[in-house]
From Swiss-Prot, chains A, B:
Recorded family membership: Belongs to the metallo-dependent hydrolases superfamily. DHOase family. Class I DHOase subfamily.
Protein's name according to its UniProt entry: Dihydroorotase
EC number(s) on file: 3.5.2.3
Organism: Bacillus subtilis (strain 168)
Annotated binding of substrate, by residue: H61, F62, R63, N93, N277, H308, F322, G323
Annotated positions binding Zn(2+) 2: D151, H178, H231
Length: 428, 428
């Protein structure tokens, strides 16, 4: 299949708008510039649209196997494509956990069979993510594991994390950490702060996260391992990562859209669509996250897309599962809040969602270049619409942003040269 | 009892030698200047001697109760006085541990009955220092606990340390931490480095210490607790403390003479007198400790005086207990190495052993001032002698410095107005 994306504009190195047509042949970009259509290619009229590299989200939960009621690889991938994502990395906290070569191969096949975007599967660090016994890293790497993580739970002992880091470093893979010290959770369902006190809820103190990061950056230094911090959420964590980077430690970090956009004081009431892990923190934490993203302490944005059924979320704050969806709302929310109404440049936002995650993990995606994978997202920056969870292609409707009006929506997504999503008005 | 210390010289604010006589009446200094003897006072001729504030060592092991073969409060105090120390803080890893009001009162009485210097007893953080259950901080404070520590073992769970810090902060006491993650000890008896590899010994990696400090400074920040790091030994630990101080966290740290003087490459062979915990680290670690002391990251020097019987130490490296004595060798070694043959000023060294520990813990000692406690040490900076463990007043002879020639020896010590030690040629 061959496409010619005509009349759109791209952002150049300096973030300036530049008119450019893009030719896609098979899975790759084969030409960029002023191009005329050839016979056997489908023209996509991108007039007035931003032609962006496909977004990259290195933290999604597709729930398959075992949680198909919440999401499947197929529905998750469709949601990603609709959100403009062409590459996602799927967390291993499924049932079963991909902690063996066979399990990983099953997931890979499932991706091949059902996914419309590139899905990079994480393998778990420990068997069944219980934290006691390490998985076979070498075998899992061979089976295509993207990196290793027990996301959803923290690695509780330093010794286990240190051994995992040494093993990961030996096979040039990253350790990706959900940072949570179980002895500091206190049965909390929200951040230990204004909201928890006002509502008589147990709160999860910021140290629950920051102490693991502080531990792990030292272990990563000693093991010379690439250590990546999932969903960073506290100002102290940002400081620890900043100091670690200053010391030359190979640490990267991601932040979620919801932690950039909301803090605990924004939680309107006991609405479980505002319950995620880590929780929404204080205004000072949110400010520190934004500052950390802007000064490079935090490397990129990742949604931590975590679908649950409405039934699961339809209970009290203490009992509801943690997590919200994010793939289909990330760009509109972030563009509206930080670019259109904020101080970020468009390029900054695009980079946080494309090239930055790829640079952090050495992935050959996230840019528009001849010869590179044809991962392309067309964005209508003028389009205004209200977030409507009923239109989500994700099975998960658990979002706190339902009803919010946003500007700037992805309207078509080409993943590895295939049209993965399109609002039905572009392709001729 | 009243003393007049005549003809000695003291160091003024700028570290300059100044002739000054000092009158001691009862427990306090009552006059400093050009003084003439009165009838009923004993004159101590301090001609040619440095008259220093008494040294303060906030980390000693006096082994009583339960370890009287190694040391008693009495013998330890005598060793302290001989080393020029007038105040010491005694660690609670005795048998039994002072983890109740009654035990603490027993120790206090023992100190009153047998000690010739001021001994401030630590109480333990957890019952029997096992790490599971917190002691009654309020009761132990009432019984005179100086601060709280489980020295000898690390507090393994963040939750326990956090609760302890909150409790200590509430009663304005410090948490003093032996930083050691049990999951990172690997059965090591020396530092994981050159010496361990050359001798086929399990090594204790630096992260074993540094990860606890990194955890604890964040907990201390959240709990607003004074957190003190015992016997800091690694370059990463110095960096973590430096960053924490920069962030305004109430952390202080001590370093031992042996970690300033020796590294693992100095260990001549399988000599258990070079075995202590934390172990002697790399040359780079030693350099970082010196730098950290000089730039204020590390607050003061403490010996971690840890006597063992010669029988206990007379075994293989793996089996011997950790620890060396230090009270009777600290000043001569440090003065010789860092002042006489080094770049430190005399005042720097004296401050690290007197006012700095007192400032860190708010103790009213460590200076020569009218009205202050008469804690005074006379030092012959010209005296040259060889360290001879057989002359030690400590029961412990376990030192790696035996036979080393040093210059600069304490020759008399007045503790709270009483002559606690004197070489027999001064008092008239």
């Amino acid at each position: 299949m061959s496409y010619l994306i005509k009349n759109g504009w791209i952002l150049n190195e300096n973030g300036e708008k530049t008119q450019a047509d893009i030719r896609v042949t098979g899975e790759t970009i084969t030409a960029i510039g002023k191009l005329d259509a050839t016979d056997n290619e489908t023209v996509i009229d991108a007039k007035g649209l931003l032609v962006s590299p496909g977004f990259v989200d290195l933290h999604v939960h597709f729930r398959e196997p075992g949680g198909e009621k919440k999401e499947t690889i197929e529905t998750g991938a469709k949601a990603a494509a609709r959100g403009g994502y062409t590459t996602v990395a799927a967390m291993p906290n499924t049932r079963p956990v991909p902690d063996t070569k066979e399990q990983m191969e099953w997931v890979q096949n499932r991706i091949k069979e059902t996914s419309c975007v590139r899905v990079l599967p994480y393998a778990s660090i420990t068997i069944r993510q219980i934290g006691d016994e390490m998985t076979n890293f070498e075998a899992l790497k061979e089976a295509g594991a993207f990196a290793f993580t027990d996301d959803g739970v923290g690695i509780q002992t330093a010794g286990m994390m240190y051994e995992a880091m040494k093993r990961a470093a030996a096979i040039d893979k990253a350790i990706v950490a959900h940072c949570e010290d179980n002895s500091l959770i206190y049965g909390g369902s929200v951040h230990e702060g204004t909201f928890s006190k006002a509502n008589g809820l147990n709160g999860i103190p910021s140290v629950c996260e920051s102490v693991h990061i502080a531990r792990d950056v030292l272990l990563a230094e000693a093991a010379n391992c690439h250590y990546h911090v999932c969903h960073i959420s506290t100002k102290e964590s940002v400081r620890v990562v900043r100091d670690a980077k200053k010391a030359g430690i190979r640490v990267t970090a991601e932040v979620s859209p919801h932690h950039l956009l909301l803090c605990d004081e924004d939680i309107p009431g006991l609405d479980t669509n505002y319950k995620m892990n880590p929780p929404l923190r204080s205004p000072e934490d949110r400010a520190a996250l934004i500052e950390g993203l802007l000064d490079g302490t935090i490397d990129f944005i990742a949604t931590d897309h975590a679908p649950h059924t409405e039934e699961e979320k339809n209970t009290e704050m203490k009992l509801a599962p943690f997590g919200i969806v994010g793939l289909e709302t990330a760009f509109p929310l972030l563009y509206t809040h930080f670019v259109k109404n904020g101080s970020w440049s468009l390029k900054q936002l695009i980079d946080y969602m494309t090239i930055k995650p790829c640079e952090a993990f050495g992935l050959p995606y996230g840019t528009l270049q001849t010869g590179q994978a044809a991962d392309i997202t067309l964005i209508d920056l003028e389009k205004e619409a209200v977030i409507d969870k009923e239109t989500f292609l994700s099975k998960g409707k658990n979002t706190p942003f339902n009803g919010i009006s946003c500007t700037g929506w992805p309207v078509a997504t080409i993943a590895a040269g295939k049209l993965a999503y399109e609002e039905g008005r572009l392709v001729k």
